């Protein structure tokens, strides 16, 4: 995702937010706290499993998937959380997917989108999300803090996504509990697991870390297991002929 492409996405989001109604806040869906679960289950590399029909880099991935059945298969086979793409224009997602999945699973759900405004946070919570994504590259640091604090007041957890050391330092200054490292280079569009391995040298003991993107095989997961609490996996699961086998392969016991 080039910076130019990220800018296009953010321009689209700004247009969407302008048209978006401010919803009344509904009760928070009850499930366990992701951070607490990750802290208490550090003997395993946990899998956050994603429901994603398409992406800008790959195009259509799996348009015919039964999203609820896919999410329930994830849950039944050890996923710690379901990530749901809700961006319509670039990822062929929908807020209804989040609403449907959240109503049919017991575990936390993550609203995976480009969040730039409080209205989106309320909307995510009302649709059943208990965790939202905030992307450091998409927000000025002051605005990132405003949205992080707002989500926290609403009882939501936040996955703060980073791509490089400067962004990781922003996440640390923010006091983020759960920090993601996206292995996709924003400038070249290339993905490299070494991004996660390199940034792990700068991790703090009191934070929880999730590696995102480009994780396909058990070998990939084993490479990340020494450094991370969890991995976020989408394409590998959406393309898998045997979803159960694939998700089991990615859950690494650390012993």
From Swiss-Prot:
Transmembrane keyword on record: no
GO BP terms, alphabetized: L-tryptophan biosynthetic process
Domain of life: Bacteria
Keywords, sorted A to Z: Amino-acid biosynthesis, Aromatic amino acid biosynthesis, Decarboxylase, Lyase, Tryptophan biosynthesis
Gene3D superfamilies to which the protein is assigned, alphabetical: Aldolase class I
InterPro entries referenced in this protein's UniProt entry, alphabetically: Aldolase_TIM, Indole-3-glycerol_P_synth, Indole-3-glycerol_P_synth_dom, Indole-3-GlycerolPSynthase_CS, RibuloseP-bd_barrel
Name of this protein: Indole-3-glycerol phosphate synthase
Source organism of the structure: Streptococcus pneumoniae (strain Hungary19A-6)
Gene: trpC
């Amino acid at each position: 995702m080039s910076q130019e492409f990220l800018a296009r996405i953010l321009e689209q989001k700004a247009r969407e937010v302008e048209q978006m109604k401010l919803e009344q806040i509904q009760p928070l869906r009850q499930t366990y706290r992701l951070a607490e679960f990750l802290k208490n289950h550090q003997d395993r590399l946990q899998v956050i499993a994603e429901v994603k029909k398409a992406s800008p880099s790959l195009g259509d991935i799996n348009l015919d998937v039964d999203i609820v059945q896919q999410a329930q298969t994830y849950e039944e086979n050890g996923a710690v959380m379901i990530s749901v793409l809700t961006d319509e224009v670039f990822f062929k997602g929908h807020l209804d997917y989040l609403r449907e999945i959240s109503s049919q699973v017991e575990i936390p759900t993550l609203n995976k989108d480009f969040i730039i405004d409080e209205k989106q946070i309320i909307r995510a919570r009302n649709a059943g999300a208990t965790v939202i994504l905030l992307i450091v590259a998409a927000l000025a640091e002051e605005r990132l803090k405003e949205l992080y604090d707002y989500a926290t007041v609403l009882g939501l957890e936040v996955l703060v996504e980073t791509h490089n050391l400067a962004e990781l330092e922003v996440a640390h200054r923010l006091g983020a509990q759960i920090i993601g490292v996206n292995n996709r280079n924003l400038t070249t569009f290339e993905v490299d697991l070494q991004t996660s391995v390199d940034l792990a040298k700068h991790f703090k003991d009191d934070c929880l870390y999730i590696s995102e993107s480009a994780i396909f095989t058990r070998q990939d997961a084993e490479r990340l297991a020494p450094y991370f609490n969890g991995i976020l996996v989408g394409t590998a699961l959406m393309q898998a002929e045997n979803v159960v086998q694939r998700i089991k392969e990615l859950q690494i016991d650390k012993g």
